A protein has these predicted regions:
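Conserved acidic donor-binding segment of nucleotide-sugar-dependent glycosyltransferases
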Residues: 82, 86-93, 102-107
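Acidic donor-binding loop of glycosyltransferase active sites
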Residues: 35-50, 65
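C-terminal alpha-helical cap of glycosyltransferases
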Residues: 127-143
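A short, well-ordered alpha-helix in the C-terminal region of glycosyltransferases
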Residues: 98, 102, 109-123, 136
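Conserved acidic donor-binding loop of glycosyltransferase catalytic domains
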Residues: 43-45, 70-72, 77, 88-89
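Short alpha-helical segment that forms part of, or immediately flanks, the ligand-binding pocket
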Residues: 32, 54-62, 73-77
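Short acidic alpha-helix that forms the nucleotide-activated donor recognition element
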Residues: 27-39, 62, 80
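Nucleotide-activated donor-binding/catalytic signature segment of Leloir-type glycosyltransferases, i.e.
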Residues: 8-30
């Protein structure tokens, strides 16, 4: 099945200082090592009714990396409003290109986006909050 977002990214001609890394399959350690070296994380997804890309979002936030992501209304992070990344509409080729070029040409702002993302991860996506939410669900279903 064709993915217009991936095709849009592949059509972009990245600047010399941008490496595009596509990883397919489950290689968690290798993926984590590659992501940690990145200047930015790009998450390009199909239009869905579920949270495609959420794990990658949380990982990028935790690593303090700015994010460029398809505007999936199911992802509970408004990257633009929170200042931790850039959202791009599905299939918006020029939007993807502008977002990548912006991150590449504004390294200090990209660094600040990453810092804001890390702060968000520490506040919202931490083990304490996760444990509390799991405990609440278990408590609810055990009644």
């Amino acid at each position: 099945m064709p993915n217009p977002n991936l095709e849009a990214v592949e059509r972009c001609q990245p600047a010399d200082n941008i490496d595009v890394v596509k990883i397919c399959g489950l290689l968690p350690y290798e993926i984590a090592r590659e992501v940690a070296k990145a200047d930015c994380v790009v998450i390009c997804c199909h239009r869905t009714r579920y949270t495609a890309g959420l794990t990658t979002v949380v990982e990028a936030l935790a690593l303090g990396l700015p994010i460029i992501c398809s505007r999936n209304p199911q992802i509970p992070v408004d990257f633009d409003r929170l200042g931790c990344g850039i959202s791009v509409e599905y299939g918006d080729v020029e939007g993807w290109q502008r977002a990548v070029e912006y991150i590449a040409s504004h390294p200090e702002e990209a660094r600040k986006m990453g810092c804001r993302g890390r702060e968000l991860a520490e506040r919202m996506f931490n083990d304490e909050r996760c444990a509390k939410e799991v405990a609440e669900v278990i408590k609810e279903i055990s009644l």
